[in-house]
């Protein structure tokens, strides 16, 4: 994810402090009115640069975890699959806004390329690690995606861009400890739970826009734990993990198992 990996310098913070780099904000702030073509071209160009640079082959079932969190305003928010940039209508935009990625199973290989800054690598299907592009920096996209900023701010930026308005962002960079990042609460939702059978019409209704229903599902959903924070070491040339949040293949298997038990597949 280029919007996560372009943040690579360690300036401005030391120790276990992680400072937010406002890459998204500055990119949007530099887009002229009605200049969507330039913005989309920029992202498409950079996407092409990195998509061929993935050196680790992994097999995927094309299954994505449905993940919710409560953001800083206490609003229950879907953070994966990401809906940021969906209004642009481009698959490459989605690739750039996607924060959650399945990691390779070979932990010993990852240990050679990454430093564990806090916590540990996942040992169970419901455990994840935050992958920083460098030990003391975090992209504002990841900050928004983890609910550490009000997600409506980013949505409003995107709406302004789409409406041809200039974006004015006046946020000061945030600073976090590794513990702050590991304390983010995530919930795994079974997609079929977002549907409820309507006996009158004999159909399953999608209730994902019903806030009361979503709250009930969220409250009863299983928790995902962020058990570690990692960053590439100086000798890392493989970049086998994308910056963002990495989860084990066992989570994918768990999701498939849940789907197989559901009445709706």
Predicted regions and their residues:
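Basic-flanked hydrophobic alpha-helices used for secretion and membrane insertion
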Residues: 1-265
């Amino acid at each position: 994810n280029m919007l996560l990996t372009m943040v690579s310098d360690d300036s401005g913070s030391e120790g276990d402090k992680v400072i937010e780099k406002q890459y998204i904000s500055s990119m949007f702030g530099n887009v002229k009115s009605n200049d969507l073509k330039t913005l989309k071209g920029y992202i498409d160009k950079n996407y092409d640069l990195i998509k061929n640079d993935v050196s680790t082959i992994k097999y995927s079932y094309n299954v994505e975890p449905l993940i919710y969190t409560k953001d800083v305003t206490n609003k229950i928010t879907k953070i994966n699959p990401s809906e940021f940039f969906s209004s642009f209508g481009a698959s490459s935009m989605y690739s750039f806004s996607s924060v959650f990625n399945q990691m390779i199973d070979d932990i010993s290989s990852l240990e050679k390329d990454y430093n564990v800054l806090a916590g540990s690598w996942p040992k169970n299907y419901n455990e994840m690690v935050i992958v920083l592009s460098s030990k003391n920096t975090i992209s504002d996209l990841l900050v928004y995606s983890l609910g550490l900023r009000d997600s409506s701010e980013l949505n409003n930026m995107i709406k302004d861009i789409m409406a041809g308005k200039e974006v004015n962002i006046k946020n000061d960079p945030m600073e976090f400890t590794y513990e702050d990042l590991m304390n983010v609460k995530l919930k795994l939702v079974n997609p079929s739970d977002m549907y409820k059978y309507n006996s009158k019409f004999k159909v399953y209704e999608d209730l994902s826009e019903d806030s009361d229903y979503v709250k009930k599902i969220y409250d009863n959903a299983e928790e995902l734990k962020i058990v570690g924070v990692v960053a590439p070491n100086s000798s890392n040339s493989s970049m086998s993990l994308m910056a963002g949040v990495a989860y084990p293949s066992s989570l994918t298997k768990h999701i498939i198992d849940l789907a197989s038990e559901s009445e709706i597949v």
